[in-house]
Amino acid sequence: METKIKKQRSLYIPYAGPVLLEFPLLNKGSAFSIEERRNFNLLGLLPEVVESIEEQAERAWIQYQGFKTEIDKHIYLRNIQDTNETLFYRLVQNHLDEMMPVIYTPTVGAACERFSEIYRRARGVFISYQNRHNMDDILQNVPNHNIKVIVVTDGERILGLGDQGIGGMGIPIGKLSLYTACGGISPAYTLPVVLDVGTNNQQLLNDPLYMGWRNPRITDDEYYEFVDEFIQAVKQRWPDVLLQFEDFAQKNAMPLLNRYRDEICSFNDDIQGTAAVTVGTLIAASRAAGSQLSEQKIVFLGAGSAGCGIAEQIIAQTQREGLSEEAARQKVFMVDRFGLLTDQMPNLLSFQTKLVQKRENLQHWDSESEVLSLLDVVRNVKPDILIGVSGQTGLFTEEIIREMHKHCPRPIVMPLSNPTSRVEATPQDIIAWTEGNALVATGSPFAPVAWKDKIYPIAQCNNAYIFPGIGLGVIASGASRITDEMLMSASETLAKYSPLVLNGEGLVLPELKDIQTVSRAIAFAVGKMAQQQGVAVKTSAEALQQAIDENFWQAEYRDYRRTSI
């Protein structure tokens, strides 16, 4: 798809002098022209040389390389972001392969754990339970009036690291950075939010540097009433905003999604975004093998909201390929810490009940135990696909992977848990245990694997392939809701850009250098589906593409003109 770069018009702004230099969205640093320095009272406040953004980015890249640890690199990049956002995004886009793991997973996990220690400057909105009666005032304090995308967390389930309290703010900040870097959504349109409802992390409560509300987490009615107050305040201030729920605990994630998805344009990336990118990956892998997803047998390790969300979207896709719902569900097997989910299991969660296997259908299985372990399931199902969303390291053992490979010559193994310390098995081990025959996709980034004189590229099943395009598509089309069909169209579009499908070799997912192209294509597919579903005003394909082009922000400086407040 051709990328059209819109001409940048001059920007009229009222700020000048040091105030302008302290405004990250407007600051150009040494790139202010001589005329701008005169007009905005900047003469003498900057070094003599006027630099281009590429010259600035080259200096920043040299400085970045001087940092030895990933967390120090993260802190450095966040400092640039809080000083000069345009430069930050130009730098990140120039080095996306290198910097995406630093600004988001896996490094963002450490940044969340150390949030209060490494805190430098305010970004986003912190809404504590103590301030619940000031919700409208808090949102009125947001300086950017035209907010189009909000990412909100309550910090309770940050990646695989658990309760990080307000340290969870690192996730919305990082996520929105990818909305801009990958999806071209202007940073001026984005807002990270953390709902500070306390923390049950005793280490944080005992930490003298912890900056959040020092109180155990509120629960039950108090919690849901507080979240509802936030949603209503958002609807009042920005009625057309896209709201993304991020890293809420399993007990709250699905109820909140179900409660609000038809009230405000919203989605949960952990459930729906992860499902969409996983399904897109599996569609591509199946096509590359000359088959369809509906022909595969799939085993999950992890039956939480994320795992069940992926499973439901796989079932929906296989139904689109011709299976009945019953046949589709019989091909998906969910294993959690209590074993295979069956209809005789007590205390199932509501979203798990449709994903059980009937115990009567398992009587012929080769197992002496009442609890059917992952190994039992792999041995009896003989799956083609194994997906890990358990958040527990090392659970894909050599015995399990070799048992899978015994019955499947080209297994697809996807250890998706984040961060890397929580991955079910490393790509290196999976490749070795399958004699180089496995197709591996992970949730966190891994280097290519060298095994027996051959290099195996490892695809990262990164939600960043999906959610930036969804956001751009929603903004461009004016969609009022995000439907399951819109998510499915994103998966289908992602699969079309697989190098393995297009060329018969290479990664199952596109290279990161192509992610803006993929995001624009997903935006078009999502916007078109929104129109077909009646949640966006119908336009021509040309008009939709023009809206995408016009909303696609470029990390380039604009000329400034002085105006009064």
From Swiss-Prot:
Divalent metal cations. Prefers magnesium or manganese. NAD(+) binds at R157, D270, N418. The keyword NAD applies. The active site is at Y104 (proton donor), K175 (proton acceptor). A divalent metal cation binds at E246, D247, D270. The record marks D270 as: Important for activity. Belongs to the malic enzymes family. Homotetramer. HAMAP family: NAD_malic_enz. This is NAD-dependent malic enzyme. It comes from Citrobacter koseri (strain ATCC BAA-895 / CDC 4225-83 / SGSC4696). The gene is maeA.
